Amino acid sequence: MMQDLRLILIIVGAIAIIALLVHGFWTSRKERSSMFRDRPLKRMKSKRDDDSYDEDVEDDEGVGEVRVHRVNHAPANAQEHEAARPSPQHQYQPPYASAQPRQPVQQPPEAQVPPQHAPRPAQPVQQPAYQPQPEQPLQQPVSPQVAPAPQPVHSAPQPAQQAFQPAEPVAAPQPEPVAEPAPVMDKPKRKEAVIIMNVAAHHGSELNGELLLNSIQQAGFIFGDMNIYHRHLSPDGSGPALFSLANMVKPGTFDPEMKDFTTPGVTIFMQVPSYGDELQNFKLMLQSAQHIADEVGGVVLDDQRRMMTPQKLREYQDIIREVKDANA
């Protein structure tokens, strides 16, 4: 029984709550609907009031113009003033009534447009009035009168500078380079030359005298005049000397007994022109130098005691040809 009562109370309470909620929603919607219905009316009324106020302002502005036309009807003007003060219902009539006189009011400004064109031609009349006032150019000629005085002063030194400038190129001796071809003619005048080669020990060492003597003799050199060795046309020492070998250390002489002899190097030289073909003699001289260097463990150097190069060999050959052509 208790459980049935609880269920009944719960159901009744739920129904009551639902009824209250439905009643609340219904009343709220009713109030909202009434509010929305009243708002457009209020808006319309407010708009009408605003329109009536604007029309009153327009009537007040245009009443002056309307009064001009109704000057003879004095009582009608008094009624219009009294009608303008009451409720806005009477204010809707003046705009319609004043709408007719407004059209002629807009026309007079159109009639005033032509007089505006009339003053325009008067403007060009004023422009020439400003144009004939060139009083300022009268001041400009005053300044050039002062300017010409310094201008000739500056123009005077300019010709002086120009006078100095032509003097400088006159002093420049440009034709002197013509004398350069003269030394070129001196080269073919060389009628003799000395071709020099050196066979030297490596840096910090010296050539052994006994090894040096054996290599010199194998190359065909024979001890002779001026206490140096000579390479003759024939290996037995007969015939003219083709080139010679001297000591690199001054005075350049040798001692035939070279067992205890040491030297940093020897010099081989050939005088051009020489007997026979100088180019062939030069090749024989180069072969002798290379043979001696290989035997004693030295190197072949040029006349400046630098490592012999193919370029230096061609230079020696060119010198030999030059001397041969000069003596031809």
UniProtKB/Swiss-Prot annotation:
Bilayer-spanning residue ranges: 7-27
CDD domains: ZipA
Gene Ontology cellular-component annotations: cell division site; plasma membrane
Domain of life: Bacteria
Ranges of Low complexity composition bias in the record: 99-115, 123-171
Keyword Disulfide bond listed: no
Keyword Cell inner membrane: yes
Pfam family, one: ZipA_C
Membrane topology (Periplasmic): 1-6
Record topology, Cytoplasmic segments: 28-328
Region Disordered, residue ranges: 42-186
The entry's keywords: Cell cycle, Cell division, Cell inner membrane, Cell membrane, Membrane, Transmembrane, Transmembrane helix
Bilayer topology annotation: Single-pass type I membrane protein
Composition skew (Acidic residues), residue ranges: 51-63
Subcellular location as annotated: Cell inner membrane
Subunit composition and interactions: Interacts with FtsZ via their C-terminal domains.
Family to which the UniProt record says this protein belongs: Belongs to the ZipA family.
Stated role: Essential cell division protein that stabilizes the FtsZ protofilaments by cross-linking them and that serves as a cytoplasmic membrane anchor for the Z ring. Also required for the recruitment to the septal ring of downstream cell division proteins.
Name assigned to this protein: Cell division protein ZipA
Lineage of producing organism: Bacteria, Pseudomonadati, Pseudomonadota, Gammaproteobacteria, Enterobacterales
Gene: zipA
